[in-house]
Structure formats: structure tokens, C-alpha cells
Design a protein with these regions (language model features):
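Structured alpha/beta or helical-core interaction and ligand-binding surfaces enriched in interleaved
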Residues: 1-113
Length: 113
């Protein structure tokens, strides 16, 4: 796995969005992970996918197709304001794409397999 370097301490998420856009272009499916208490974001992600049946007791996984609507949603998300623990780039804890790309820990870690 190769870590993609970028400055996740930025006050805006433009660089994160630019990297996401590049990788979304070649992806066909996604999987989003949210913690159980992130109900607003679980409901939001469910507009673009369905709940994956798994045994993760601490959260929910949403899977779906990388459609134009999904890409637009990801790229138009505002940078979260709750940045005390993480300087969040996205409200989603993890976003995995079928092309091996992942945005983890609220977008502070980007990886490519």
C-alpha cells in the first residue's frame, strides 16, 4: 500500500477534493464507513448506496456505484467544522473505492493499493 502525501493540516479541503476527483474517475464502486453515532452522515450516504450486511458493531458500511451524483456529492461536501480530534477533510470516517484508493480517518490518510 502506498500512502498519498498531502497537507491535511490545511484549513480548506480543496487538495483532498482534487485527489478524490482523480481517483473517483476510475472507480466503479464505493464503500463508506461511518460510526454508529454519525446518523446524519449514514442517512446521507444511504441516498447513494445501500447498507452492507456485516458484523461491524460500532458502525455502518454503505456500498454503491460511483455515479455522477455520488461524485458530485463527494466533491461538493463542505469541510467539516468539528476538527478538534482530526482536521477532517470529509464527514465520512472512511471511503474505499474499488480501484484500491482509500480516504481514511476523515480524509487525513489517503492510500492507494
Amino acid at each position: 500500500m502506498e500512502q498519498i502525501e498531502f497537507d491535511y493540516t490545511q484549513p480548506i479541503n480543496d487538495e483532498w477534493k482534487k485527489i478524490m476527483e482523480k481517483h473517483l474517475r476510475t472507480a466503479k464502486t464505493f464503500e463508506i464507513h461511518c460510526w454508529n453515532e454519525e446518523t446524519t452522515w449514514i442517512e446521507y450516504a444511504l441516498k447513494y448506496g445501500t447498507l452492507k450486511n456485516d458484523d461491524w458493531q460500532y458502525g455502518k458500511n454503505i456500498v454503491g456505484l460511483v455515479s455522477t451524483d455520488f461524485v458530485n456529492m463527494v466533491l461538493q461536501l463542505p469541510k467539516p467544522k468539528d476538527t478538534e480530534i482530526y482536521n477532517k477533510m470529509t464527514p465520512f470516517f472512511s471511503i474505499f473505492l474499488d480501484n484500491g484508493f482509500s480516504s481514511e480517518h476523515y480524509g487525513t490518510e489517503l492510500n492507494q493499493q
